[in-house]
């Protein structure tokens, strides 16, 4: 298993293996590995958006969540809103081993990496990253959260 597949497998696994792995790495290596994961997730996002566009072309309609991110947030519960934007550092138990799934998740990762090599999909940076310096509403939410 190459390094990219290994990273994606432990990232998608439903435990804290990815955080354990990152905690054991030097900062430069950890940031490079995070960028590798972002690259794979951007590919999956591009694949989903392209598939969504095809379905909409034949009349199946999705709500335009990607056009205005505010539709994704439920502002009725401010505690969950604060948790969403005010991330706390992750506690990682160093004694437990990193688990690498060798079943269906590994098959999914293998298929994803092969498809990514074969199908070049590109996303605009604005689709994958919300810059709080350019988005006033997002910046205002963050400033309110950081005052508390």
Swiss-Prot record:
InterPro entries: Poxvirus_J1. This is MF7 protein. It comes from Myxoma virus (strain Lausanne). The lineage of its organism: Viruses, Varidnaviria, Bamfordvirae, Nucleocytoviricota, Pokkesviricetes.
